[in-house]
């Protein structure tokens, strides 16, 4: 097993807390803080393959032995083919500009616009209090892994941006937010499609979407990015899945995506 995975495990502790996704449940969460650590691309691949997620320096992994409802999901980018509805999203966004930025470059050019967009997204989607510039920067622009920022411009305006980890063979979405006025363009779906396309063009193998949780409608869009693989924490192996989960769990959910943590 890769030494870096052992290193994260060695620094981690199991904390029992109210589950973020199922508040009626007290769940054990593996947590670690990787202060002042720089991960190599290979180490990033490894932590993703082992089911870890992170926000800034904080790494976490839901691994409840009696639950198994929070399953890491990834897409083999060479096998992905957009569905009919996803092709319609691409057609609708023919004039939408998609770019990838290094975090520093993006911050210098767009961080104030990005923060304003992010706070509108939090308010409309979740009724959450706004973040200040320092909180926003520390949460998304500081990372032990190499990070990229995916950006959408519609009619010259910043319409959405997402933060991603880049490994040697992997691209992993951390968080995506968009300006609610552009909801009709399906920016969450469009950004996923373009990020997968970028991953394929750059020779990557996997695109990680965080957790797939069958019972949470806001996460069911992940089951529509097919084919996908789910991590079995019990065996430590990724299992290929074609379409049944996506069809069964998304049929009655709203088409709008709510991309965020998880």
Predicted regions, residues:
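Acyl-donor binding region in acyl/amide transferases
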Residues: 16, 23-49, 54, 113, ...
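Short linear sequence elements within intrinsically disordered, low-complexity coil regions
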Residues: 26, 123-126, 243
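Active-site/acyl-donor-binding loops of N-acyltransferases
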Residues: 71-78, 206-262
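Short, basic, helix/turn surface patches
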Residues: 80-92, 196, 232-240
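Glycine-rich loops and low-complexity Gly/Arg-rich segments
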Residues: 98-99, 128-129, 187-190, 197-200, ...
């Amino acid at each position: 097993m890769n030494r870096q995975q052992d290193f994260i495990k060695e620094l981690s502790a199991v904390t029992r807390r109210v589950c973020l996704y199922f508040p009626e449940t007290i769940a054990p969460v593996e947590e670690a803080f990787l202060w002042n650590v720089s991960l190599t691309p290979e180490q990033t691949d490894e932590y993703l393959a082992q089911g870890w997620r992170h926000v800034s320096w904080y790494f976490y992994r839901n691994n409840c032995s009696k639950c198994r409802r929070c399953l890491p999901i990834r897409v083999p980018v060479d096998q992905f083919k957009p569905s009919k509805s996803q092709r319609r999203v691409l057609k609708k966004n023919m004039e939408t500009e998609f770019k990838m930025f290094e975090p520093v470059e993006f911050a210098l050019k767009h961080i104030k616009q990005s923060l304003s967009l992010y706070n509108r997204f939090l308010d409309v989607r979740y009724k959450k209090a706004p973040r200040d510039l320092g909180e926003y920067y520390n949460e998304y622009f500081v990372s032990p892994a190499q990070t990229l920022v995916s950006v959408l411009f519609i009619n010259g305006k910043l319409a959405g941006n997402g933060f991603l980890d880049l490994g040697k063979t992997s691209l992993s979405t951390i968080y995506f937010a968009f300006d609610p006025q552009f909801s009709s363009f399906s920016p969450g779906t469009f950004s996923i499609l373009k990020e997968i396309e970028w991953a394929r063009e750059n020779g990557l193998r996997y695109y990680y979407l965080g957790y797939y949780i069958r019972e949470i409608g806001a996460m069911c869009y992940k089951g529509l990015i097919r084919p996908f693989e789910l991590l079995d924490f019990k065996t430590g192996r990724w299992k290929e899945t074609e379409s049944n989960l996506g069809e069964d769990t998304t049929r009655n959910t709203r088409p709008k995506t709510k991309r965020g943590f998880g």
